[in-house]
């Protein structure tokens, strides 16, 4: 028998990385929020790798921070090693990665949730979504507790009817031995959502005391220590070392000899696996000519002996895991503390969602995280933040926050999922962002913090800090307009940097465009130049070195911006439009894109179809441009 237990503005189902950001955004925007969690000991659980960030994922964390989210601050407080990746490549792909103490990370996030004034955290299972008159009205929990609300955000991760596989054994449970959610899938089906089965996995954890690190390569953290949050000051702490080792022919022999015992290859698992984080057995089958695969050995925290074997995700039987691991250099006597496993779970087709991550057919229902078909903590947190903001704006009857592909990686993520969908766990990559030179991790605050300010997630103090940084950059750019004569001192400096000499006066800004010249070099020449913070100096140098490419991308955005501004009504009758191909009519009717730009990215919709749509819209004489009050992000320009 159900019993009524309270009314909330917004209810968040799940307290993983998506649920945490969604609940905090909702509460901080003034909405009375309830966050339901299957187990309070699993808040922000790092069930797989003990790390935040990485290639493209670090960009997402910086954007979450710039909009007022929590992940970056939590990673900065709980890291045990920080490394900037891809420094040998261009600035667009520089990505920060933190090895974190996963238990401290969980506790830190739980404390933040518990301390938020408008937020109630409760251990219970959301089992049913209540819909009345076509709108969200509340939820019912598995024990019969009923809550009313105006919006629900589903962030259940990999827990919906999850199934763990280790060799021939299959167990109905969630990650790390936690309980799974059994009822919500049925409720989602009744609401009309198409559910699929996806699969991911995790490697074994081994005891630090059983490893011989002298046979492995050391991987040290960066000094000075970088940070994710734009609020974090300079950090000084002793960092832990990670290690690198490799598989070998014997490792491969043992795994391949037991391939039929892997549920992925025995036919036991039919769910779609992740392409970009394959199991070790999948790697050996897909890349048979590769002699070895690298493995990173990573500590899971400061107060545990558990070491994470990155690159060795597996669902092989326990005995095969033990035998194959002991063939690795330094692992001859290794002891497994937790076995690797595969997990399959229910997820929705994300093309049922709008760019806000709200359901197209049910106002007030939002989805975020792995339930949407994505993979990764950072992708989940980014979706959680976006869904939380838009749920709060929905409850307030305010325009939504729509991040475009030219605004943020979060915009690319939302657009890819809602427009293209995915047939396998979706992972963010820099190659997915066509404007990645503009969407660098270093300028996330300059791109997004003013948007966060408008949603109410950015404090006065933080906004003032951003304004000071902008003025610092502007003052430096004005100073770089000055011209210096071709003195001996200048040419000696250029020679020392392997740059050609000058014979006439030259602008300081022009000098800075040279590959080997940095702002500190110019300070030596012109002591009157304003000194800059590291963050401002980085912006000045990147703008100088990549200025031509940046302008080309901005011009590309300006050319295509018109399509993004042309709205398509949600009830637009595509079937009645003569000239649209049958496939285009079917795809557009099913997807109901928000604008012409989104329509153009749907598989099966051709440029000719877009031209037909543009003509039809003009004939209808409808207002096709975003107005100032139709999207929070509209007057934001890069």
What is each stretch, according to the model?
Residues 7, 24-128, 143, 155-172, ...:
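Conserved N-terminal/central alpha/beta ligand/cofactor-binding core
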Residues 130-146:
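Conserved beta-strand-loop-beta-strand element in the redox core of flavoprotein oxidoreductases
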Residues 4-18:
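Beta1/beta-strand and adjacent pyrophosphate-binding region of the FAD-binding site
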Residues 432, 449-611, 615-631, 636-638:
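Extended, charge-enriched "interface" segments that sit outside catalytic cores
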Residues 308-374, 402-415, 533-587, 592:
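A glycine-rich dinucleotide-binding beta-alpha-beta segment and adjacent secondary-structure elements
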């Amino acid at each position: 028998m159900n019993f009524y237990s309270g009314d909330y503005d917004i209810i968040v189902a799940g307290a993983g990385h998506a649920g945490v950001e969604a609940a905090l955004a909702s509460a901080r925007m003034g909405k009375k929020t309830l966050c339901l969690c299957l187990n309070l000991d699993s808040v922000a659980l790092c069930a797989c790798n003990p790390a935040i960030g990485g290639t493209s994922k670090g960009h997402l964390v910086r954007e979450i921070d710039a909009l007022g989210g929590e992940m970056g601050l939590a990673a900065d407080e709980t890291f045990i090693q920080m490394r900037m990746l891809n420094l040998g490549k261009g600035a667009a792909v520089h990505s920060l990665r933190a090895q974190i103490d996963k238990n401290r990370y969980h506790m830190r996030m739980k404390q933040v949730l518990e301390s938020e004034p408008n937020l109630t955290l409760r251990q219970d299972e959301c089992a049913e979504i209540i819909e009345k008159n076509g709108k969200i009205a509340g939820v019912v929990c598995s024990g019969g507790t009923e809550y009313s609300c105006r919006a629900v955000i589903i962030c259940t991760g990999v827990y919906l009817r999850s199934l763990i596989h280790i060799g021939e054994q299959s167990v109905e449970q969630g990650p790390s031995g936690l309980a799974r959610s059994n009822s919500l899938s049925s409720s989602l089906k009744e609401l009309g959502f198409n559910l699929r089965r996806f699969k991911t996995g995790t490697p074994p954890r081994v005891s630090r005391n059983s490893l011989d690190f002298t046979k492995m390569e050391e991987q040290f953290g960066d000094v000075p220590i970088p940070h994710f949050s734009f609020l974090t000051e300079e950090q000084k702490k002793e960092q832990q070392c990670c290690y690198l080792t490799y598989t070998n022919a014997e490792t491969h022999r043992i795994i391949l000899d037991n391939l039929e015992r892997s549920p992925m290859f025995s036919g036991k698992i039919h769910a779609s696996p992740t392409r970009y984080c394959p199991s070790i057995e999948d790697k050996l089958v897909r890349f048979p000519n590769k002699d070895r695969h690298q493995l990173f050995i990573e500590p899971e925290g400061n107060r545990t002996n558990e070491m994470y074997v990155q690159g060795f995700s597996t669902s092989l039987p326990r005995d095969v895991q033990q035998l194959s691991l002991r063939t690795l250099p330094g692992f001859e006597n290794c002891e497994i503390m937790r076995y690797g496993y595969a997990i399959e779970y229910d997820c929705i087709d994300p093309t049922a969602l709008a760019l806000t991550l709200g359901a197209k057919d049910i106002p007030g229902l939002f989805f975020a995280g792995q339930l949407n078909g994505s993979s990764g903590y950072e992708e989940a947190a980014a979706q959680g933040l976006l869904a939380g903001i838009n749920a709060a704006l929905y409850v307030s009857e305010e325009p939504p926050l729509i991040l475009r592909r030219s605004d943020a990686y979060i915009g690319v993520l939302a657009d890819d999922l809602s427009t293209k969908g995915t047939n396998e766990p979706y992972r963010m990559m820099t190659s997915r962002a066509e404007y990645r030179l503009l969407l660098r991790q270093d300028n996330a605050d300059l791109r997004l913090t003013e948007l966060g300010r408008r949603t109410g997630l950015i404090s006065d103090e933080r906004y003032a800090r951003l304004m000071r940084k902008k003025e610092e950059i502007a003052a430096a750019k004005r100073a770089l307009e000055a011209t210096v004569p071709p003195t001996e001192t200048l040419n000696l400096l250029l020679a020392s940097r392997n740059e050609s000499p000058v014979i006439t006066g030259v602008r300081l800004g022009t000098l800075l465009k040279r590959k080997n010249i940095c702002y500190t070099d110019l300070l030596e020449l012109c002591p009157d130049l304003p000194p800059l913070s590291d963050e401002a100096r980085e912006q000045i140098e990147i703008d100088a070195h990549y200025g031509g490419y940046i302008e080309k991308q901005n011009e590309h955005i300006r050319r295509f911006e018109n399509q993004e501004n042309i709205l398509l009504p949600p009830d637009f009758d595509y079937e009645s439009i003569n000239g649209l191909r049958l496939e285009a009519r079917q795809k557009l009717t099913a997807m109901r894109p928000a604008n012409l730009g989104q329509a153009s990215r749907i598989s099966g919709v051709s440029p000719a179809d877009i031209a037909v749509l543009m003509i039809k819209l003009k004939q209808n004489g409808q207002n096709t441009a975003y107005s100032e009050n139709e999207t929070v992000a509209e007057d934001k320009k890069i």
